[in-house]
């Protein structure tokens, strides 16, 4: 019988990202090898325990986010950010496609000084590359309190792949990810 010690357990990290509707981000990050969990939620606002309805008004200040738990020995924070900047438009202030409001802002909530450094480096590399005609408006902030979204928002695309928004918006982002990052797709999704 093998002894279970802390040395045998992976040291997991968190990444918290907002870039439009959380259903899109959740669907992508769930398919990445090394990602252990993805929770759709809200962060960055003043009201504790916000509801979807209150966040949708734009009055709470929260962003729709995904809180990702990952094994950095399998997938790096930089990898997660490179995916992030491919699957959403970081140059549009407070909207993605037809989703408008501060709750859809592009934001990276960091959980360490190292994550903040990497996030700033990746944004600077994007700016220097001139991939986008407009400046990157992604906010980089220390992670605030994160509130999980309601249960019906969790695993949304997996449960409703043919729902209108999922078919029109989420599926194309997922396809874009799968085409560009084949080596990062978890075996069960390959």
UniProtKB/Swiss-Prot annotation:
The active site is at 21. Its EC number is 1.8.4.11. Transmembrane segments: none annotated. GO terms for biological process: protein modification process. Keywords: Oxidoreductase. It holds the Pfam family PMSR. It catalyses: L-methionyl-[protein] + [thioredoxin]-disulfide + H2O = L-methionyl-(S)-S-oxide-[protein] + [thioredoxin]-dithiol; [thioredoxin]-disulfide + L-methionine + H2O = L-methionine (S)-S-oxide + [thioredoxin]-dithiol. GO terms for molecular function: L-methionine:thioredoxin-disulfide S-oxidoreductase activity; peptide-methionine (S)-S-oxide reductase activity. Belongs to the MsrA Met sulfoxide reductase family. Has an important function as a repair enzyme for proteins that have been inactivated by oxidation. Catalyzes the reversible oxidation-reduction of methionine sulfoxide in proteins to methionine. This is Peptide methionine sulfoxide reductase MsrA.
């Amino acid at each position: 019988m093998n002894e279970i010690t802390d040395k045998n357990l992976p040291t997991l990290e968190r990444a918290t990202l907002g870039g439009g509707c959380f259903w899109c981000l959740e669907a992508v990050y769930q398919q990445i090898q090394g990602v252990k969990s993805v929770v759709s939620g809200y962060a960055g606002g003043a009201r504790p325990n916000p509801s979807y309805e209150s966040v949708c008004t734009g009055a709470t200040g929260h962003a729709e986010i995904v809180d990702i738990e990952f094994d950095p020995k399998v997938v790096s924070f930089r990898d997660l950010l490179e995916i992030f900047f491919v699957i959403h438009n970081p140059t549009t202030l407070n909207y993605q496609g037809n989703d408008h409001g501060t709750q859809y802002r592009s934001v990276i909530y960091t959980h360490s000084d190292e994550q903040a450094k990497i996030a700033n480096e990746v944004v600077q590399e994007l700016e220097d590359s001139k991939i986008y005609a407009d400046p990157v408006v992604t906010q980089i902030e220390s992670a605030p309190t994160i509130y999980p979204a309601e249960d019906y928002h969790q695993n949304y695309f997996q449960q409703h792949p043919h729902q209108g928004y999922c078919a029109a918006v989420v599926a194309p982002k997922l396809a874009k990810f799968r085409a560009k990052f084949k080596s990062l797709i978890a075996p069960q999704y390959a």
